[in-house]
Swiss-Prot record:
Role, per record: Required for the formation of a threonylcarbamoyl group on adenosine at position 37 (t(6)A37) in tRNAs that read codons beginning with adenine. Is a component of the KEOPS complex that is probably involved in the transfer of the threonylcarbamoyl moiety of threonylcarbamoyl-AMP (TC-AMP) to the N6 group of A37. Kae1 likely plays a direct catalytic role in this reaction, but requires other protein(s) of the complex to fulfill this activity.
The protein's required cofactors: Fe(2+)
Protein name: tRNA N6-adenosine threonylcarbamoyltransferase
PROSITE patterns referenced in this protein's UniProt entry, alphabetically: GLYCOPROTEASE (PS01016)
Length: 324
């Protein structure tokens, strides 16, 4: 069977085409800015402009005709309303035009589910991106959130810090390079509340320290990463201990960070559990993960009426019953 998935929850538009065990195409285009963040309206305009050429490119790469596709999947949420609506409208149009079934996919769940293409069975997922930071795992037929950010996502915190010091967007790779040259640890707020996290405090203090001119930028970047990532590892380790699961996966755009990978790998080795990171094109926001999750849902008998494809900006991870 073949599924086509459309992702567009934030600044990346992605279209993926997959079978049960293979990615046939996974193409994307990301809206970037030199200064400032991403405006929802700009993201929607970006997606609308590029949907048709990106769809054509995906079909060409996969060497399939749209008529060969068995199901259309799309990211139903959570995300930016205007961007989500562009994607949902496109998915509905394809489904109606070619008489194909359609399914809406939870973006956060898809990030973890795509690891099952690589033999992962039942992991604890550390999902780290711009808008989301969650520690989640399947329990009682739903993906339960064992810990999450109480304010901003770790990726958003890093990008905002980069923007405040004039590095532009996206800031993750730039901050990571600076951090690699850091030599001195500077104390920054470490905020873990129960199983939840907060990154607004560390962001504010890092910017304040930078503006004093008393600290090397490389040292601030290094300390920012070490402190924030240690908090992520702590909560992930607690979730592993609570659930008794023997696999940990790292997903989301921030999974590209080598220091975070290294820290999570060390924790996994100390607990003698499996650690896995998908190829980066399947870590970041992408259409293939939406297609894969949609195909699993479709094979389990899940079908959506067009009326049920309304987008959900605040689509909770534990809102969806997992029957596939």
């Amino acid at each position: 069977m073949i599924a086509l998935g459309i992702e567009g929850t934030a600044h990346t538009l992605g279209i993926g085409i997959v079978t049960e065990d293979k990615v046939l195409a996974n193409v994307f285009n990301t809206l970037t800015t030199e200064k400032g963040g991403i405006h929802p309206k700009e993201a929607a305009e970006h997606h609308a402009k590029l949907l048709r050429p990106l769809l054509k490119k995906a079909l060409q790469e996969a060497k399939v005709n749209i008529k060969d596709v068995d199901v259309i999947a799309f990211s139903q949420g959570p995300g930016l309303g205007p961007a989500l609506r562009v994607v949902a409208t496109a998915a509905r149009a394809l489904a109606l035009r070619y008489n194909k079934p359609i399914v809406g996919v939870n973006h956060c769940i898809a990030h973890v589910e795509v690891t099952k293409m690589f033999g992962i069975k039942d992991p604890v997922g550390l999902y780290v991106s711009g808008g989301n930071t969650q520690i989640l795992a399947l329990e009682g037929g739903r993906y339960r959130v064992f810990g999450e950010t109480l304010d901003i996502g770790i990726g958003n915190a890093i990008d905002t810090f980069a923007r405040e010091i004039g590095l532009g967007f996206p800031g993750g790779p730039k901050i990571e390079k600076l951090a690699q040259r850091g030599e001195k640890y500077i104390e920054l707020p470490y905020t873990v509340k129960g199983m939840d996290l907060s990154f607004s405090g560390i962001l504010t203090e890092a910017v304040r320290k930078y503006k004093t001119g008393k600290y090397k930028l490389e040292d601030i970047a290094y300390s920012f990463q070490e402190t924030a990532f240690a908090a992520l590892i702590e909560v992930t380790e607690r979730a592993v201990a609570h659930t008794g699961k023997e696999e940990v996966v790292l997903v989301g755009g921030v999974a590209a960070n080598n220091r975070l990978r290294e820290m999570l790998k060390t924790m996994s080795e100390e607990r003698s559990i499996k650690f896995f990171v998908p190829p980066y094109d399947l870590c970041r926001d992408n259409g293939a993960m939406i297609a894969y999750n949609g195909l699993r849902m479709f094979k389990a008998g899940i079908r959506f009426n067009i009326e049920e494809t309304i987008v959900k900006q605040k689509f909770r991870t534990d809102e969806m019953e997992v029957t596939w």
